[in-house]
Amino acid sequence: MALPEFSMRQLLEAGVHFGHQTQRWNPRMSPFIYGARNGIHILDLTQTVPMLDQALKAVRDTVAKGGRVLFVGTKRQASGPIAEAAEKSAQYYMNHRWLGGTLTNWKTVSQSIQRLRMIDEKMEGGAEGLTKKERLGMERDQAKLQASLGGIREMGGVPDLLFVIDVKKEALAIAEANKLGIPVVAVVDTNCSPDGVDYIIPGNDDAARAISLYCDLAARAALDGMTAQLGAAGVDLGELEEAPAEEALAEEAAAEA
């Protein structure tokens, strides 16, 4: 099983090494800081490279064992890449707002998912028997529930691993995962604490290019895991009528060619 490859140059070009202003640092991140330049902390990429590799291995191994990965990133610049990565690797995501109790109170969350399914069915059936006002209200509910729960509606239970962008913003998600003993992979910037993170990726968590790179690598690691899982089950990917995440696998093959 080959992990997705990346180079130090790619990390540099994406700005992974740029931390925050030195006065905004969290001392818990000092072991991963190389130095400072123009009042900005610079992360030590010689540490980020092997740690990112370990994090990707955790993603791949989780999926290879049949586990579920939940991608979490609710801030503006992470929202798109998080959803895209999860969708192309047949995983799950939260990219709108973390709902308290998503993990620790899954029963209630699954009831909301059930409500979303019922609304979807009703709307697909033309919302018969509803007044215009009721229909509008239902459309609003549908949009709200879809934004909050659309990425986890098929998850079917708590995930086996969390992949997080911005530990400060997603502190509640990490706390819930810690409480349930769910391992956490996360990008940790110089202004954050790595506490509660099992697989730390020291890196910039604000730059769009850096976020896209992390998400793309994690998606590819998940796809590697899926290929391994199907291979172990004796499934020939070439014989499947509809290969899982077929488009993503084809893209990967094209990129390697």
Curated annotation (Swiss-Prot):
It comes from the Bacteria. One of its GO terms (molecular function) is structural constituent of ribosome. The keyword Iron does not apply. PROSITE patterns: RIBOSOMAL_S2_1, RIBOSOMAL_S2_2. GO terms for cellular component: cytosolic small ribosomal subunit. SUPFAM superfamilies: Ribosomal protein S2. The keyword Ribosomal protein applies. Gene3D superfamilies: Glucose-6-phosphate isomerase like protein, domain 1, Helix hairpin bin. Belongs to the universal ribosomal protein uS2 family. This is Small ribosomal subunit protein uS2.
